[in-house]
């Protein structure tokens, strides 16, 4: 089977199922008579820019992101690593302290991502307040950020 078709199947599986392990993709592909190794699936995941995000049940599962969403995610990762000084959390609130003059950029990137767990952000010069509906939603955001930083 051609690589493009295999990768199309992988994207389809990731959209239809909560895939938390590469071995699960190997199994699903085998059911479609596509025999591949875990190493091949790993390369496909990298090429497809699949990202692991927390599911509702707390598992880290693969997700397909649009190119635009992916670019915002990459920008956020880069900026967070460059400017974040400290992150504090309480209940449904997350406070991100940044180097002076950088909080607004972090807020804009968060808004572009449009994460459903985030109600909104309020940013000043060096502080960005991320507001979630609940503590569990804030924990999902915190988990994503910990993977990034």
UniProtKB/Swiss-Prot annotation:
One of the GO biological process terms: regulation of arginine metabolic process
Subcellular location: Cytoplasm
One Gene Ontology cellular component annotation held by this UniProt entry: cytoplasm
One MF annotation (Gene Ontology) recorded for this entry: cis-regulatory region sequence-specific DNA binding
Protein keywords: Arginine metabolism, Cytoplasm, DNA-binding, Transcription, Transcription regulation
Zinc as UniProt keyword: no
Family annotation (Pfam families): Arg_repressor, Arg_repressor_C
Domain of life according to the entry: Bacteria
Pathway info: Amino-acid degradation; L-arginine degradation via ADI pathway
InterPro entries hit by this protein: Arg_repress, Arg_repress_C, Arg_repress_C_sf, Arg_repress_DNA-bd, WH-like_DNA-bd_sf, WH_DNA-bd_sf
Annotated NCBIfam families: argR_whole
Record function comment: Regulates the transcription of the arc operon, involved in arginine catabolism.
Family assignment from sequence similarity: Belongs to the ArgR family.
Protein's UniProt name: Arginine regulator
Organism: Bacillus cereus (strain ATCC 14579 / DSM 31 / CCUG 7414 / JCM 2152 / NBRC 15305 / NCIMB 9373 / NCTC 2599 / NRRL B-3711)
Lineage of producing organism: Bacteria, Bacillati, Bacillota, Bacilli, Bacillales
């Amino acid at each position: 089977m051609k690589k493009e078709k295999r990768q199309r199947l992988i994207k389809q599986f990731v959209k239809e199922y909560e895939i938390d392990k590469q071995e699960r993709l190997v199994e699903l592909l085998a059911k479609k008579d596509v025999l591949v190794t875990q190493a091949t699936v790993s390369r496909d995941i990298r090429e497809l820019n699949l990202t692991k995000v927390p599911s509702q049940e707390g598992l880290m599962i693969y997700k397909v992101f649009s190119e635009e969403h992916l670019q915002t995610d990459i920008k956020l990762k880069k900026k967070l690593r460059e400017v974040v000084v400290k992150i504090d959390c309480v209940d449904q609130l997350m406070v991100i302290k940044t180097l002076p003059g950088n909080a607004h950029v972090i807020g804009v990137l968060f808004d572009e991502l449009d994460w459903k767990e985030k109600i909104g952000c309020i940013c000043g010069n060096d502080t960005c307040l991320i507001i979630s509906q609940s503590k569990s939603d804030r924990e999902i955001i915190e988990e994503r950020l910990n993977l990034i930083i």
